[in-house]
């Protein structure tokens, strides 16, 4: 099985037909493919592989002028590069199997230490993973997994594997650690953003940063070489380790875990691999990550994280900021956009709690060029805060309803201690879910308001958005707070009063209004 020339990548053609494509086909005939047909974390991992090969084949692009020539140069360059390095993409090569380490030893008998490859799939019921969508995997480590699925899972596992306890193996006589670090794409449950174009080839070019843009994040660090060109010989191979973990190209296809598949790809040996320094330790952010200011006074920076309870569109204003020299902003790919260019933004994320995978998500947003203007994105952000204000008010109203109806509620909340937020979350959950579902169905109103800025329609569109928020909060309150008994009616009235009360105007805003009135 050759990862470069044999088909294993799930794609969709321009006609909408699903098929498997090879790495060579994606990079040389991608104009015939519409998109990938994979899970969110798999999309990010595959795109990193495509970009790594494209950079290596082109030895660039070094600047914007070279970036513009990528469509003409990449097909031939990729074909020649993959042919030159064909042996390094052999999955079962005797001495240099792709993304594996030959000659690993478990330190046990010949049969012991080999585990099922199902552990590489976050979506499979194996180890601590949930069985919710994979009942077949319960107590069934011997099931047959197709080799193409194993390759995709192996690549994604290297990028997104969370740290924790791990089996130990021997690499060149040295035993690996029993504790592992995070893969480069999973720290802080970071959000990843990719541009999408009309076909897969255009999408790859859109996300291929020039070396000028890469230097914004990596400064004087070396661009490096792909891991298959400088594969470490052992844990003591400092030069190859540095290339793999501290350079742009080296990190795109990481070796977070060292592994070796058996002859039929059904089992594997796996241990801790190379440690990849994260953003929290001062290392540059990943090219698809979003960096925000956490503390304006201290100018503390952090990665934009995915929280399963918060829809991605509420963070959109931070994602579309063009990354600046100090590293704050969205993905590097935004720097290739012209000022008047609209774009589709794919937002993918994987949420984790320590070593447990919680959820994956993916959304696609149409971003008008005007929305990327700072003043307009600030309006979008302000209106998102307005929607969150209504959500908070809905939660307080539901609490008032419960307190009036249940005399012991306040005591339970007070005695809940550290689990207070969990208790309140359960109380708010149904109402909040209904509210946000209604709001998301009407996101077009927010986009229409933003598009109307500077025109006579700005006030009507804003009022329509605000009216929808108010009505959605009221509908959610009515749905979860019953009115069947006198006590319920009294409790409903208390909560309704808080929900419908006019919002308090901040003192600063009151002063501005007085000045305006003269």
Question: Predicted regions span which residues?
Answer:
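Extended alpha-helical scaffolding segments
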Residues: 1-132, 156-518
């Amino acid at each position: 099985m050759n990862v470069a020339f044999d088909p294993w990548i799930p794609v969709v053609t321009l006609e909408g037909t699903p098929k498997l494509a090879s790495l060579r086909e994606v990079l040389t005939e991608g104009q015939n493919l519409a998109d990938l047909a994979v899970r969110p974390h798999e999309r990010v991992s595959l795109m990193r592989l495509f970009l790594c090969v494209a950079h290596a084949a082109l030895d660039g692009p070094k600047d914007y002028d070279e970036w513009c020539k990528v469509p003409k140069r990449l097909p031939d360059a990729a074909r020649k590069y993959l042919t030159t390095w064909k042996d390094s993409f052999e999955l079962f090569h005797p001495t240099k199997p792709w993304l594996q380490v030959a000659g690993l030893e478990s330190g046990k008998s010949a049969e012991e230490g080999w585990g099922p490859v199902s552990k590489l799939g976050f979506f499979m019921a194996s180890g601590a993973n949930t069985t919710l969508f994979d009942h077949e995997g319960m107590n069934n480590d011997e099931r047959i997994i197709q080799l193409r699925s194993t390759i995709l899972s192996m690549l994604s596992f290297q990028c997104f594997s969370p740290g924790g306890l791990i089996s130990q193996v021997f690499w060149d006589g040295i035993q690996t650690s029993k504790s592992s670090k995070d893969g480069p794409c999973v720290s802080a449950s970071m959000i990843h953003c990719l541009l999408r174009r009309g076909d897969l080839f255009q999408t790859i070019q859109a996300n291929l940063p020039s070396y000028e843009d890469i230097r914004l994040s990596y400064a004087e660090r070396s661009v490096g070489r792909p891991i298959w060109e400088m594969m470490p010989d052992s844990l003591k191979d400092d030069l190859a380790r540095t290339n793999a973990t501290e350079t742009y190209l080296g990190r795109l296809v990481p070796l977070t875990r060292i592994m070796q598949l058996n002859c039929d790809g059904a089992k594997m040996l796996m241990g801790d691999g190379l440690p990849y320094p994260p953003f929290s330790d001062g290392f540059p952010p990943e090219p698809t990550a979003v960096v925000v200011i956490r503390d304006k006074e201290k100018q503390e920076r952090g990665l934009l994280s995915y929280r399963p309870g918060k829809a991605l569109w509420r963070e959109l204003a931070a994602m579309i900021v063009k990354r600046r020299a100090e590293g704050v902003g969205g993905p590097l790919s935004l720097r290739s956009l012209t000022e008047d260019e609209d774009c589709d933004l794919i937002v993918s994320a994987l949420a984790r709690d320590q070593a447990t995978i919680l959820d994956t998500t993916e959304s696609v947003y149409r971003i008008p060029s005007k929305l990327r203007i700072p003043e307009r994105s600030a309006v979008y952000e302000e209106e998102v805060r307005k929607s969150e204000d209504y959500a908070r008010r809905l939660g307080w109203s539901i609490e008032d309803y419960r307190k009036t109806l249940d005399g012991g509620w306040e005591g339970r909340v007070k005695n809940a201690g550290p689990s207070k937020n969990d208790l309140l979350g359960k109380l708010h959950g149904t109402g909040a879910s209904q509210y946000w579902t209604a709001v998301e169905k009407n996101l077009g109103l927010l986009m229409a308001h933003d598009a109307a800025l500077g025109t006579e329609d700005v006030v009507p569109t804003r009022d329509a958005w605000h009216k929808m928020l108010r009505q959605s909060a009221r509908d959610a309150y009515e749905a979860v707070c019953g009115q069947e008994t006198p006590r319920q009616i009294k409790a409903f009235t208390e909560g309704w009063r808080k929900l419908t009360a006019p919002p308090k105007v901040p003192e600063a805003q009151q002063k501005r209004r007085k000045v305006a009135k003269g």
